[in-house]
Amino acid sequence: MFILSSSSSLPSPLSLSSSRVSLPPPSSSSLNLLPLSPHFQPPNLACSCSVASRSTAELLHDFKHSAHTAASADEARNHLPHSRAFLDVRSEQELLSYIRREAEAGKLPSNVAAGMEELYQNYKNAVLKSGNPKADEIVLSNMTVALDRILLDVEEPFVFSPHHKAVREPFDYYTFGQNYVRPLIDFGNSFVGNPFLFKDIEEKLHQGHNVVLISNHQTEADPAIISLLLEKTSPYIAENMIYVAGDRVIVDPLCKPFSIGRNLICVYSKKHMFDIPELAETKRKANTRSLKEMALLLRGGSQLIWIAPSGGRDRLDPSSGEWLPAPFDASSMDNMRRLIQHSGVPGHLCPLALLCYDIMPPPSKVEIEIGEKRVISFNGVGLSLAPAISFEAIAATHRNPDEAREAYSKALFDSVSMQYNVLKAAIYGRQALRASTADVSLSQPWI
């Protein structure tokens, strides 16, 4: 329900002028970040093609104006009266009945109402499988709040800025997301690899360094899962991480309330670049703003950014029948490295492995329409971090710059894959802590 990282094309050469930022031209490919217009509104879900009629100019409002507009819209929605009947329901029957009444009254698009019902049933089934004696109570409590927030956003859509900061008050969207995903995790069969390295990262952040986590990406719930696995030992990291997020999770009504609770850099996804062909070039040109926003953040130091250079979620390999990390895009990696290098403060790129696909697996293929089916399960998950990998050390063994970039991307990907296999052995191989290796020390800090 949350994050979809992205990749796309960058105009080249690129020059960003600012009193604080000066960047060299990126490589011939891309960093792959494409910002959303701050005024981008969800398409009419009754017709997935309706967004095509939207003027391209609407996607490119001035950034300064956008920041003010987003703040004003957020302030207005917090004082806007909206139907709160979801919070008053006391049973499943009342909840489902209210969804149907809202749809019949025209307050909910029919497909959003259907998505709400499907989400409720799938969430209920997953939590019941946990064996928690309070499962029914947990389901009703969490789903009433979730549906209340979804309905609020349908009535008064939230507007994301290119750099969105998690909304913690007057309603705490971060805690809401944590509480919603928590019952889906089998903590008895979940693991964190090398937790001491997260402590090292936190120390570097407090020293003013930047850290970029180069990760695979498995589900929309990745940010909540990462935060839940770190909340006991590294709450600062859990709450302050910035995620590079694709446009769909800030447009889909069932995703938006969860995305509101995360720190995001909002981008357009390469996989959806040509969904509306006439907007493709506009999206590419808009990339300058997103680059500038990230560059400004990194220039200030103490930033922790999560990015998936694969450009999307890992998907089931039809030949092997396994979920494996999707390959990284070397040009994306190189441009991220160059942003760090030219930020003016120390920076580190660290490989992070995430295994959680069973919690909320993506569709088997990339879909154009907004509103994918949400399959939800109760399962163990895993997270593992490895030390930063130095580009200079790898480049020293390659005379050809292109070969050095490819080798660096491969080194990061190989580390993620290695850690992923350890997590897989622990969770699905039932080896638990015995799956630890010389490079990955597994722990369960919540026990």
UniProtKB/Swiss-Prot annotation:
<keyword id="KW-0808">Transferase</keyword>
<comment type="pathway">
    <text>Phospholipid metabolism; CDP-diacylglycerol biosynthesis; CDP-diacylglycerol from sn-glycerol 3-phosphate: step 1/3.</text>
</comment>
<keyword id="KW-0934">Plastid</keyword>
<dbReference type="InterPro" id="IPR016222">
    <property type="entry name" value="G3P_O-acylTrfase_chlp"/>
</dbReference>
<feature type="short sequence motif" description="HXXXXD motif">
    <location>
        <begin position="217"/>
        <end position="222"/>
    </location>
</feature>
<feature type="transit peptide" description="Chloroplast">
    <location>
        <begin position="1"/>
        <end position="48"/>
    </location>
</feature>
<comment type="function">
    <text>Esterifies the acyl-group from acyl-acyl carrier proteins (acyl-ACPs) to the sn-1 position of glycerol-3-phosphate. The physiological acyl donors in chloroplasts are acyl-ACPs, but acyl-CoAs are used as artificial donor for in vitro reactions. The enzyme from chilling-resistant plants discriminates against non-fluid palmitic acid and selects oleic acid whereas the enzyme from sensitive plants accepts both fatty acids. Squash is chilling-sensitive. Preferably utilizes oleoyl groups (18:1-ACP) and has lower affinity to palmitoyl (16:0-ACP) and stearoyl groups (18:0-ACP).</text>
</comment>
<dbReference type="InterPro" id="IPR038114">
    <property type="entry name" value="GPAT_N_sf"/>
</dbReference>
<feature type="region of interest" description="Disordered">
    <location>
        <begin position="1"/>
        <end position="21"/>
    </location>
</feature>
<keyword id="KW-0012">Acyltransferase</keyword>
<keyword id="KW-0443">Lipid metabolism</keyword>
<dbReference type="Pfam" id="PF14829">
    <property type="entry name" value="GPAT_N"/>
</dbReference>
<keyword id="KW-0809">Transit peptide</keyword>
<dbReference type="Pfam" id="PF01553">
    <property type="entry name" value="Acyltransferase"/>
</dbReference>
<keyword id="KW-0150">Chloroplast</keyword>
<keyword id="KW-0594">Phospholipid biosynthesis</keyword>
<dbReference type="GO" id="GO:0016024">
    <property type="term" value="P:CDP-diacylglycerol biosynthetic process"/>
</dbReference>
<dbReference type="InterPro" id="IPR002123">
    <property type="entry name" value="Plipid/glycerol_acylTrfase"/>
</dbReference>
<comment type="similarity">
    <text>Belongs to the GPAT/DAPAT family.</text>
</comment>
<dbReference type="GO" id="GO:0009570">
    <property type="term" value="C:chloroplast stroma"/>
</dbReference>
<keyword id="KW-0444">Lipid biosynthesis</keyword>
<dbReference type="GO" id="GO:0004366">
    <property type="term" value="F:glycerol-3-phosphate O-acyltransferase activity"/>
</dbReference>
<dbReference type="InterPro" id="IPR023083">
    <property type="entry name" value="G3P_O-acylTrfase_N"/>
</dbReference>
<keyword id="KW-1208">Phospholipid metabolism</keyword>
<protein>
    <recommendedName>
        <fullName>Glycerol-3-phosphate acyltransferase ATS11, chloroplastic</fullName>
        <ecNumber>2.3.1.15</ecNumber>
        <ecNumber>2.3.1.n5</ecNumber>
    </recommendedName>
</protein>
<dbReference type="GO" id="GO:0006655">
    <property type="term" value="P:phosphatidylglycerol biosynthetic process"/>
</dbReference>
